[in-house]
Amino acid sequence: MSHIRAGKTKPEEIVAKYLFSAGFRYRRNVKNLPGTPDIVLKKYKTVIFVNGCFWHMHEGCKYFVWPQDNAEFWRKKLFANKERDEREQIELTRLGWNVIVVWECELKKDKREATLQNLVATLRENRNESNKL
């Protein structure tokens, strides 16, 4: 498990490339923010986490299935991941960041375009809201 490295997963690359092609500029895996967000759009005061459905317990998702082997280990591990995610999102919100979570299953071919279009619309809406302040 210690050899599993974060960053530059295929789902993250899909989101990053789409955002770049839509004119957004960002930083990847910013370590000085809680949770080391996958994508940080400072101009929009927004962070994006691209979460794997298994590792982050996407409830109700067909891609999240409890492992049968070593069940107690996985239960503890995955619940700890979920609790950590919640703590980090609360802290980021407290610091004034907008937090967006994109799930791996939302980037499957049948949902990808709609998900990415909604993401861009949300970012532009957030930007417009922050300009009103």
Give names to the regions the model predicted.
Residues 1-101, 105-133:
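Nucleic-acid endo/exonuclease domains
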